[in-house]
Regions:
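Mid-sequence acidic-hydrophobic segments that form the walls
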Residues: 90, 125-132, 150, 154, ...
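N-terminal polyanion-binding entry modules of DNA glycosylases/AP lyases
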Residues: 1-142, 146, 204-237
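C-terminal end-helix/capping segment
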Residues: 96, 179-207, 236-237
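Catalytic DNA-binding helix-loop module of base-excision-repair DNA glycosylases/AP lyases
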Residues: 71, 143-189, 215
């Protein structure tokens, strides 16, 4: 699970800047008018900082964010954090680079909590980054849809994984995670639906949030956090 960030801000970054305050004010005002359902979620949280949750994570580049997302597939946030801490311990207190992960003993990665399938996915991704088939600088400069197409070509990496990385590592401001079970439940509660919305229904609702879908999503996730001590697993890879 991820929370929306102002543009250009990734995990582990909490430095204040004037442009951020301006951006938040503009985005909140836009969302209040665009979707009355979001207005009380915004107004009831005047001190809500959409970067606060991210600040609990170590600084992540694109590979680190994808590692975090892959590790978190089908897991709660708490379980993902535990796995991440064990992985960091294997690499001297930091997330591994692609080269470091390729050099690691897969058995140790398994003991850290990664499934064999996830290890295979991460090694495949690390190999593509290490041998030049994928260039992280080029990837980071791509529009969301092109980056999605490049990364979802890798077995084990689906839209949910990439969507989270877009927010965590790149601070993309117009991202929504329609396959996330917690978000779908949050939408059901906020919109008082009598059913769990499917992905397409979430996307249809989220159209009115453009170009601030990441921030709108963060408010809904915040409401979900407040209703439960932990977050259920995502429904998507």
């Amino acid at each position: 699970m991820v929370m929306g960030l102002p543009p250009g801000k990734g995990a582990g970054q909490v430095t204040e800047d004037p442009s951020r305050a301006t951006w938040l004010q503009q985005a909140r005002s836009y969302l209040r008018q665009a979707d009355p359902v979001l207005a009380p979620l915004i107004d009831d949280r005047p001190d809500f900082d959409p970067r606060a949750w991210m600040a609990q994570l170590p600084p992540m580049d694109l590979y680190g964010a994808l590692l975090f997302q892959v590790a978190g597939q089908q897991l709660s946030v708490a379980a993902t954090r535990r796995t991440l801490a064990r992985i960091e311990a294997l690499f001297g207190g930091h997330l591994p680079s692609p080269a470091e992960l390729l050099a690691a003993d897969p058995g140790q990665l398994r003991e850290a909590g990664l499934s064999w399938r996830k290890i295979g996915t991460l090694r495949d991704l690390a190999g593509r980054l290490s041998d030049g088939r994928l260039d992280p600088d080029v990837l980071s400069s791509l529009p969301d849809d092109e980056l999605m197409a490049q990364l979802t070509a890798i077995p084990g990496i689906g839209p949910w994984t990439v969507q989270g990385a877009l927010i965590i590592a790149l601070g993309r401001e117009d991202v929504v995670l329609p396959g996330d079970l917690a978000l779908r439940k949050a939408v059901r509660a906020a919109y008082q639906l009598d059913h769990l919305p499917a992905e397409q229904e979430v996307l249809a609702i989220a159209e009115k949030w453009r170009p601030y879908r990441s921030l709108a999503t963060s408010y809904l996730f915040s409401a979900a956090f407040e209703r439960t001590a932990d977050v259920p697993p995502s429904a998507r890879p």
